[in-house]
């Protein structure tokens, strides 16, 4: 069993734990940007994370995504070589899908970091904070 939960709500805010990139078959989307994975594939991985985040957010909303008042913040960790500097472009894969799904309420504050490694060798891990109605 995990030593954490997928989300915690306090007041009107819900904090989603980090979600790692997974392929359509459920396997970990492993690799490092700047070595194994190009920016475009990293964006696809970040978009896949956004799909999973939305699923967790839906669970936090009792199944009703209309309760999402705003996506407040996204924090993205990109498994990167030391000389890779396009973490922000990779993270756009997540941010753009949130905008498509939630419209103006999907526009959010964001941080994108390059890190030396992510659990299970995943290429991207993203966490999210949302405000609920």
Give each language-model segment a name.
Residues 1-133:
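Short, polar/acidic, helix-capping and beta-turn segments at strand->helix junctions
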């Amino acid at each position: 069993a995990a030593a954490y939960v997928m989300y915690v709500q306090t007041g009107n805010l819900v904090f989603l734990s980090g979600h790692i990139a997974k392929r359509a078959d459920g396997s970990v989307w492993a690799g490092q940007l700047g070595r194994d994975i190009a920016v475009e594939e990293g964006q696809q991985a970040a978009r896949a994370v956004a799909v999973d985040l939305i699923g967790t957010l839906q669970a936090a909303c009792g199944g009703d995504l209309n309760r999402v008042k705003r996506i407040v913040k996204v924090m993205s960790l990109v498994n990167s070589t030391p000389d890779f500097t396009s973490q922000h472009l990779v993270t756009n894969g997540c941010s753009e899908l949130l905008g498509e799904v939630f419209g103006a309420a999907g526009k959010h504050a964001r941080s994108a970091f390059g890190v030396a490694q992510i659990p299970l060798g995943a290429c991207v891990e993203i966490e999210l904070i949302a405000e609920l109605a």
